[in-house]
């Protein structure tokens, strides 16, 4: 089932007790929250489009065929480029959708 979010869509391809695989589409010039996860790590493989990735204090461009590793506790964000970006995300650990600590959010989803 495809889940719709303000930034784009995702579909869970595999959901196991200790890992999850998603296909994610981030709309052009939209971005994830600046966030970190306490209980999981993420691995991103870019399959279409390009974007800007932020990890802790660094920022760079990421394109098809490139890979990013986001360790647990790492502050991160992805922004879709002018054509958006599609990626496969592999989560390892406790893969609960509530394990998101948002620092900044363009869509008003910061917890008060």
Regions found by a protein language model. Name each.
Residues 1-36, 40-41, 90:
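A short glycine-rich, His/Asp/Glu-containing loop-to-beta-strand
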Residues 14, 25, 35, 45, ...:
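Well-ordered beta-strand positions
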Residues 22, 32, 58-62, 99-101:
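Short beta-strand segments
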Residues 23, 43, 52, 67, ...:
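Short, surface-exposed charged micro-motifs
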Residues 30, 39-40, 58, 74, ...:
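A generic "binding-loop/recognition-motif" signal
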Residues 56-75:
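Short acidic-glycine-tyrosine-enriched beta hairpin
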């Amino acid at each position: 089932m495809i889940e719709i979010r303000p930034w784009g869509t995702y579909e869970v391809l595999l959901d196991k007790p200790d890992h999850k695989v998603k296909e994610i589409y981030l709309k052009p010039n939209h971005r994830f929250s600046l966030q970190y996860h306490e209980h999981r790590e993420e691995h991103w493989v870019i399959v279409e489009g390009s974007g800007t990735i932020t990890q802790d204090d660094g920022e760079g461009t990421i394109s098809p065929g490139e890979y990013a590793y986001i360790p647990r506790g790492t502050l991160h964000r992805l922004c879709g480029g002018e054509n958006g970006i599609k990626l496969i995300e592999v989560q390892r650990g406790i893969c609960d959708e509530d394990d998101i600590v948002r620092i900044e959010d363009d869509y008003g989803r910061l917890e008060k």
